[in-house]
Design a protein with these regions (language model features):
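Short, small-residue-enriched loops and turns at beta-alpha junctions
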Residues: 8, 29-30, 51-56, 83-87, ...
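Conserved beta-strand scaffold positions in the cores of enzyme catalytic domains, especially
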Residues: 20-23, 107
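Active-site C-terminal subdomain of aminotransferase-like
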Residues: 72-75, 82, 87-173
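Active-site phosphate-binding strand-loop segment of PLP-dependent enzymes
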Residues: 22-78
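Active-site-proximal loop->helix
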Residues: 8-17
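Conserved PLP-anchoring active-site segment centered on the Schiff-base-forming lysine
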Residues: 1-6
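Glycine-rich tight-turn/loop motif centered on a GG-T
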Residues: 17-19, 98
Length: 173
């Protein structure tokens, strides 16, 4: 189940998933509920959405979406690429800012936006990370960041994690 305003890269990933797809109206939890109600309760489901939609500047109703995921036994996958390094007490993103880190199953982030480097990551339980590494060609046929980029990313994360002033300036742009 995908928010209609998800980033093109997310939509492309969903297309490659070779599974039934349902698109819900942007940030419309009532529409999402209707779709979830129509599905077999025993069927695996994942709700895919962004925390912050950069094109129109709005935030997802993360807590409400997580509540629906709990109610309908669905997984949650959140794209925090426009939020990490910018929001939260340590730059962990909108979920950190709202105290919802423990409510989301899979996080997607980037080192290319606020951190100014290159590369991306997922954060999830060991079980999910191992499954993604095993079945996702994008992870199987890629290489790790070179040490110089990993060091630059580490430095950027440390700076933004500890300097709320810089994060605030980014938010005000």
């Amino acid at each position: 189940l995908s928010d209609e305003l998800n980033h093109a890269s997310m939509i492309e990933g969903i297309r490659h998933g070779n599974c039934e797809k349902h698109i819900f109206r942007h940030n419309d939890v009532k529409h999402l509920r209707e779709i979830l109600k129509s599905l077999d309760p025993n069927r695996p489901k994942i709700i895919v959405f962004e925390s912050f939609y950069s094109m129109d500047g709005d935030f997802a109703p993360i807590e409400s979406i997580c509540d629906l995921a709990d109610e309908f036994n669905a997984l949650t996958y959140i794209d925090e690429v426009h939020a990490v390094g910018m929001y939260g007490s340590r730059g962990g993103g909108v979920c950190e800012m709202l105290g919802l880190l423990n409510r989301v199953d899979i996080f997607n982030g980037t080192l290319a936006k606020a951190y100014g480097v290159i590369g991306g990551y997922i954060a999830a339980s060991t079980r999910f990370v191992d499954a993604i590494r095993s079945y996702a060609p994008g992870f199987i046929f890629t290489s790790s960041l070179p040490p110089s980029l990993a060091a630059a990313a580490t430095k950027s994360v440390r700076i933004l994690k500890n300097d709320t002033g810089i994060r605030k300036k980014h938010q005000d742009i």
